[in-house]
């Protein structure tokens, strides 16, 4: 079982420590949330796991291997860590099919293997009806599915999702949640950071709550929802998953 974890990662900006020794772990086949108030350090922690930010101290580990100093492309190539940014990442002037093929050009695959994998991803993400549609003409939900298909093109062990529920309508949210459940069933580990708390907790097996740069609490969605301290500092007293 592959794992993605951190050991005491820390980060300071301008003399202010924003992450203070964060420890977390994700295994293949589980969905984990990384949540917390604005300014709590969750985004910086997430970016250190992704490879966008280098920790000042501590380590990011892929199945025990220190990847703290590896760039994103080597984390993807060597350890199967894929990243979906919050910002739109599709090529606007390419069709859905060509968007997926473009990612596969970097893989050591024959043309036929690339075409076969593209067809499988189009079917898996229910994109057949828009395969010839260019990126700029996609809806928010369709664009998200194309972006996830591109993440899956490298056959990752882990997918890191940055604000995946941002900017899409309620129907697309439900669609995306089903896709995340499908990723879990296929044995992919998923780490989500998002401001949409209910949508995120609805798909997670467990979550970490960060505040003031430290892990404040961890548990299942039910455990966190019943935790009076978590409700006080983050969820609010009237929080409900209903």
Describe the function of each predicted region.
Residues 50:
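Helix-to-loop junction immediately C-terminal to a conserved catalytic motif
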Residues 155:
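Conserved catalytic motifs of ABC-family nucleotide-binding domains
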Residues 58-66, 77-79, 117:
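Conserved ABC transporter NBD signature motif
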Residues 134-138, 142:
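Conserved ABC ATPase signature
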Residues 112-130, 178-181:
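Conserved ABC ATPase "signature" region
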Residues 35-37:
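The feature captures the beta-strand-to-loop junction immediately N-terminal to the Walker
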């Amino acid at each position: 079982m592959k794992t993605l974890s951190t050991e005491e990662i820390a980060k300071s900006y301008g003399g202010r420590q924003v992450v203070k020794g964060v420890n977390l772990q994700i295994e293949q086949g589980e969905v984990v949330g990384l949540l917390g108030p604005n300014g709590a350090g969750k985004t910086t922690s997430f970016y250190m796991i992704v490879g966008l930010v280098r920790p000042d101290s501590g380590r990011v580990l892929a199945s025990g291997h220190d990847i703290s100093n590896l760039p994103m492309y080597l984390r993807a190539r060597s350890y199967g860590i894929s990243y979906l940014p919050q910002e739109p990442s599709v090529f606007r002037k390419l069709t859905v099919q060509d968007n997926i093929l473009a990612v596969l050009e970097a893989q050591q695959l024959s043309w036929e293997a690339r075409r076969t994998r593209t067809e499988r991803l189009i079917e898996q993400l229910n994109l057949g009806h828009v395969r010839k549609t260019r990126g700029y003409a996609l809806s928010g939900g369709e664009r998200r599915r194309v972006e996830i298909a591109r993440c899956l093109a490298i056959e990752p062990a882990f997918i890191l999702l940055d604000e995946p529920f941002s900017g899409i309508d309620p129907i697309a949210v439900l669609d995306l949640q089903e896709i995340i459940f499908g990723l879990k069933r296929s044995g992919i580990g998923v780490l989500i950071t998002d401001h949409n708390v209910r949508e995120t907790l609805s798909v997670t097996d467990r979550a970490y709550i960060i505040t003031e740069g430290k892990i404040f609490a961890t548990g299942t969605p039910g455990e966190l929802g019943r935790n009076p301290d978590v409700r006080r500092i983050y969820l609010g007293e009237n929080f409900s998953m209903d």
